[in-house]
Amino acid sequence: ETGCGKSTLMKIIAGFIEPDSGEVEIGQTIKIGYFGQEVDIEPELRVIDYVKEAAEFVRTADGLVSASAMLERFLFPPEQQYSPVGKLSGGEKRRLYLLRVLMSAPNVLILDEPTNDLDVETLAILEDYLDGYDGIVITVSHDRYFLDRIAKRIFAFEGAGKIVQYEGGYTDYMNKRQQPASGKTVSENASSTGASASGAQGNTASDGTDSCLLYTSPSPRD
């Protein structure tokens, strides 16, 4: 389903929206990077300057990498890096926005429909980057192949405040949801244990193909 609050939940976790009730507790060491569906970049800004506003270097699985080298990795050749952002296509702007989020070196990465408007090459680069990413990934996506590629756990919101946890990716979720009592209800557990974004572990996916899926994290002791 669409319009059931998946993106709103991501924005609440990221701190862009206040919840109607309750509190969101973020650990002191948590640094959230948010990749949303809207891209708003000053058109006069140079490509490389936009990325350097986040950081000039970022530590990856390959070591410390410069902004220019990361731009090349994300398909922006040196001659394009000094062009104004306004000359980029919509897909290129979204790719640049994604890179800037990654350059900020978050340890919790929120991806809201990350595969929208990304070409196949960029998607492959993102998936490879996530393979070596040491932090937490929380994503909303209708792309079942992407979910199977990166997700280790899915939380399904099944109405009336019921949240069911399924281990595995999208295919595992579809198979297990056909089995009686195959999922673990976590909504009551989350409220009783003080769940927060800081307790998240592993890559978590949210998908709205058949039911509204959203993220909630168990406490670290679970």
Describe each region flagged by the PLM.
Residues 1-213, 217:
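ABC ATP-binding cassette signature C-motif
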